[in-house]
Amino acid sequence: MPTRSREEYFNLPLKVDESSGTIGKMFVLVIYDISDNRRRASLAKILAGFGYRVQESAFEAMLTKGQLAKLVARIDRFAIDCDNIRIYKIRGVAAVTFYGRGRLVSAEEFVFF
């Protein structure tokens, strides 16, 4: 698969499912606050398989419903009571503007494991 810059990845045209009329992918933002270093690193590794790290404790991704379900299932198995993990789903056309230390990142299509 060809590599795309971070900017190209998030500005891909969204495909509409003809049968249901729904948009095929949604923008997802995952933020977290985990005090244990080992657990925090483990979660970051999980999230890196789905999207881009944009801050120390924040990842962005464009996911299908199925991919989102896999992500939620992995986080559900991972999370414990003292963790604070939030998943924000933005459906439809989402414009992302970044300032400051935002940088373009090249990445290949993500592999789920």
Curated annotation (Swiss-Prot):
Organism: Mycobacterium tuberculosis (strain ATCC 25618 / H37Rv)
Domain of life: Bacteria
Annotated GO biological process: defense response to virus; maintenance of CRISPR repeat elements
Cited InterPro entries: CRISPR_associated_Cas2, Virulence_VapD/CRISPR_Cas2
Alphabetical keyword list: Antiviral defense, Endonuclease, Hydrolase, Magnesium, Metal-binding, Nuclease
Effect of loss of the gene: Deletion of the entire CRISPR-Cas locus (cas6 to cas2, Rv2824c to Rv2816c) decreases resistance to plasmids encoding spacer elements about 6-fold.
Cofactor annotation: Mg(2+)
Function: CRISPR (clustered regularly interspaced short palindromic repeat) is an adaptive immune system that provides protection against mobile genetic elements (viruses, transposable elements and conjugative plasmids). CRISPR clusters contain spacers, sequences complementary to antecedent mobile elements, and target invading nucleic acids. CRISPR clusters are transcribed and processed into CRISPR RNA (crRNA).
EC class name: hydrolase
Annotated GO MF terms: metal ion binding; RNA endonuclease activity
Subunit structure: Homodimer, forms a heterotetramer with a Cas1 homodimer.
Protein name: CRISPR-associated endoribonuclease Cas2
Pfam families on file: CRISPR_Cas2
Gene label: cas2
Gene3D superfamilies listed in its UniProt record: 3.30.70.240
Binding site for Mg(2+): D33
EC number: 3.1.-.-
Entry similarity comment: Belongs to the CRISPR-associated endoribonuclease Cas2 protein family.
Additional remarks: Encoded in a type III-A CRISPR locus.
